[in-house]
Amino acid sequence: NSANWNRTDGNIYFQVTDEDCERIYRYIVKTASYERLPLEEDVVKNFSLAADAPQVAAYVGGGNYSSGVAYMYDNKKSQSTLFANPMADVYKAIELGEMSEWNFTAADGTLIKGMICLPPSFDSSRKYPLIVYYYGGTTPTTRGITSPYCAQLFASRDYVVYVIQPSGAIGFGQEFSARHVNAWGDWTADEIIEGTMKFCAAHPFVDAKRIGCIGASYGGFMTQYLQTKTDIFAAAVSHAGISNVTSYWGEGYWGYSYNAIAAAGSYPWNNPDLFVKHGSLFNADKI
């Protein structure tokens, strides 16, 4: 359960997607306000209040350089105490790439956030191929090292990695996430293309002739759709991608349930352009 009522202080504790992090917030009932807990990890996947002493909690989290780190949390002192870090020795033996935020302002004035991950033993005098990675369905690409698509894994193969969080992702505010509705690639494609070009211009160690892009599910759709919009990508990987929005809408519970929000009020018979013009199948001649 992502929400916990603390019977000691009367407040409610819950997990929040906060940009590319997973945080724990509490709702303070008396003041009707929200407060973020000052925890030690960027991505907290487990948080539990002690049943008999709710002023004490335990949580497990990680980030770009760690995973599965367990802490005890003192709610009164707002302090964390390390309980266990079973992967510490493993990560000490692995050379990880340096990661940092890289943001840009899109043509329409929107701040688009992202991160760069450099290869281990990075040499700024070299030219590196680039992998551009974006969200699927439309959850932000969270910080972390355990995903099969994590930036560190790509970087370990001697790639520079650009993780972009384009319009439509949750965790960046209601207006930003609502851009996903009845868009199917609008905004998102333009921002990925613009961001990739600006990223290359800002990083001379990137070989602009060797750029690849990758995404899964809706990100897989974006991979395919991008190939109909630009030729800047030398390689493209679409995992579980959608080529035909119409068949996706009508096949399986995932199609109609997802599109109930992603294409709210739109159907093939009342908004055919959304279902035809935004898929790679009906734009294959542009690839």
What are these regions (language model features)?
Residues W5-R7, L49:
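Residue-level recognition of a conserved intra-blade site in WD40 beta-propeller repeats
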Residues T8-G10, P54:
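Short coil/turn segments that connect the beta-strands within blades of beta-propeller domains
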Residues E22, E35-D123, Y149-Q152, S156-R157, ...:
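Non-catalytic accessory segments flanking enzyme active sites
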Residues G61, Y133-G137, S217:
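Glycine-rich His-Gly loop
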Residues L118, S125-G137:
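Short beta-strand element of the alpha/beta-hydrolase
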Residues L130, A155-Q165:
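A fold-wide structural signal in alpha/beta-hydrolase
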Residues T138-P140, V161:
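Serine-hydrolase catalytic-loop signature spanning alpha/beta hydrolases and amidase-signature enzymes
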Residues V163-I287:
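Active-site-proximal cap/loop segments of hydrolase catalytic domains
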